[in-house]
């Protein structure tokens, strides 16, 4: 389901910032990183090119001859035949960049080049898997980061179609320590109980909202 996420607005701020650098959206798996990055790119750029290193490992070959941006693009057209690269109008997504160390290193080249906005997702960045030392040349100073987690309580309320004015009223009451109405108290108490029971993972919330999904329903 298409949930409203705060990370989307943060990506808008990143895009509108002058001289922004490639951004890496980090976080646990299944929290919605890939979905929100793809949605943002498709809604804000004329063209989007996705390098999915997890499901298309052959794309790692695009970086086999170095980190020249034009050369990387030239190689990528061999494996992504429908890709369109237009300077300042194309967003490049590196999906699961932790699966391609060379792509991580190339971010410096893309940052210095400046013609393409690069967004990357990663679930295990900085983690030494199976005792193997990670030797990725991290381009210090040429990356920006966005930490993404499961839906927080406010995002959960959005997913439950809670009226925005009700959310603002309860936030104001909490800030000013003003008493809330009994109806508000009962409603938000119920929402808190649901949030504790369901959690903030997008798939779990989708299962609760959509009773037609072929999995058990929450009480």
Give residue spans per PLM region.
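Interdomain hinge/linker elements that couple catalytic modules in large macromolecular machines
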Residues: 158-219
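Conserved lysine of the Walker
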Residues: 33
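Hydrophobic anchor at the beta1->P-loop junction of P-loop NTPases
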Residues: 25
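Short glycine-rich substrate-engagement loop in P-loop NTPases that contacts/grips substrate
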Residues: 55-90
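Hydrophobic positions on the alpha1 helix immediately C-terminal to the Walker A/P-loop
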Residues: 36, 40
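Structural recognition of the conserved hydrophobic beta-strand(s) that form the central parallel beta-sheet
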Residues: 93, 117-123, 147, 156
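Short regulatory helix/loop adjacent to the ATP-binding pocket of P-loop NTPases
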Residues: 109, 126-145, 157-163
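N-terminal pre-Walker A segment at the start of P-loop NTPase domains
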Residues: 1-17
